[in-house]
Every structure is written in structure tokens, then in C-alpha cells.
Regions:
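Conserved N-terminal beta1-alpha1 strand-loop-helix module at the mouth
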Residues: 1-204
Length: 204
């Protein structure tokens, strides 16, 4: 059974409230905080309003791509539960974790086995390892068989072009599953019906 799900790319209060009020809210909700190329990007000013809600038992995740110090200082003020870091070296990741006293999701973008093996450099630093496809906002998948070499005990999450119909195949794996694009309509907006389907499916 999967550990739970992360719904990523939330950018409006209506969708956020709907998710948090669901009978089976997700373990994580992700917000794109500094990658302005993404259609899901949320500015700092909007985040201050958006995050002023009762999180209940859901972890709020700030998704960052090699963030500058001023960005990290802003994120600190928003009291996120996790920072999800792309393109951040182990040494800097450790510094961020120690300085800000926050849990870390290290995001590794995967094409081949060498990319997967990068997780070893973050052992003892990262709290969760996210294995994602290349492309950031483009949601590109990768061969999940590449993860067969990863210890089952590793706290891991999988993302990258995962569809709702893919969820059942993960049901025997001790992982978190991260979805974004699969929960959107043709206009690129989150579809609450698809979100409901996901949360009900995971909690059958």
C-alpha cells in the first residue's frame, strides 16, 4: 500500500480549501514558489494569503529550484512543513536544513540509473527522496524499474507524468505518489472531480 499522495501545483484558495476539507486529505500539498516558468507558480504575496488556512494534518511543501538566500528567508516566514529542493547540492541542502530547521524533500530528476544513484549523496540529510522525470513543469515520466536498486526502507516519493489510472499499480509499494498535471483540466486548472477521484482511490 502506498504511504500517501502529494498534490502539487495548488494556486487558488478554492481548490486548496476543497482538498483540506475532503474526508481523506492528502499527506502533502505542494506550492510552486520560485519557478516562474511554471503555470502553477504562486507569488510570495499570494502565498501569504493562500497559506493562511487550517492545514489540519496535511504537510505544506514549498517547491524550489536552486533557491537564492532571499527566497529561503521568505519561505521561512511562511512556515512550510517541507522544502522540496531541485538542483541543490548535498552540502547546500545540509546547510539549508540546519539553518532553517526544516524537513527536506530532495528532488532528483531521472533519465538513467546514474541519476537514481544520486540519492546516496543525500543520505542522512534528506527526509524524503522524490524521484521525478526530467522537465519540471512538463511532467515527463521515467522507467520506474530504475528504482529497483533503491532500498525499500528509503523514504521515497515518485512523480513524473503519473496518471490516475496508474495509482493501482503502486498499491503494493511503500512510497508516496506525487501528482499534478493528471489532476488538471484542459485549461491547466486543477479539477476538483479528479482530485476527489484520487483521494477516494488511495483510501479505498
Amino acid at each position: 500500500m502506498i504511504k500517501g499522495v502529494k498534490i502539487c501545483g495548488i494556486s487558488d484558495i478554492t481548490t486548496l480549501t476543497h482538498i483540506l476539507d475532503h474526508d481523506f486529505p492528502p499527506k502533502f500539498i505542494g506550492f510552486i514558489c520560485d519557478y516562474k516558468k511554471s503555470k502553477r507558480y504562486v507569488s510570495y504575496e499570494r502565498l501569504k494569503t493562500l497559506l493562511n488556512v487550517d492545514r489540519k494534518n496535511t504537510n505544506f511543501v514549498s517547491v524550489l529550484v536552486n533557491p537564492k538566500n532571499e527566497v529561503l528567508e521568505r519561505m521561512k516566514k511562511l512556515n512550510f512543513d517541507f522544502l522540496q529542493l531541485y538542483n541543490v547540492e548535498p552540502k547546500k541542502t545540509k546547510m539549508i536544513k540546519e539553518k532553517y530547521g526544516i524537513k527536506i524533500i530532495t528532488a532528483l530528476t531521472i533519465i538513467d540509473q546514474n541519476d537514481v544513484n544520486e540519492y546516496k549523496n543525500y543520505m542522512g540529510i534528506s527526509d524524503i527522496f522524490l524521484f521525478d522525470g526530467k522537465g519540471y513543469e512538463k511532467s515527463i515520466g521515467f522507467d520506474h524499474k530504475l528504482l529497483n536498486s533503491v532500498p525499500k526502507s528509503l523514504n521515497k516519493m515518485i512523480a513524473g507524468n503519473i496518471k490516475l489510472d496508474d495509482i493501482p499499480k503502486f498499491n503494493d509499494k511503500d512510497i508516496y505518489v506525487d501528482l499534478s498535471g493528471a489532476l488538471e483540466n484542459e485549461d491547466g486548472k486543477k479539477d476538483v472531480n479528479k482530485i476527489d477521484r484520487l483521494l477516494n482511490l488511495v483510501n479505498k
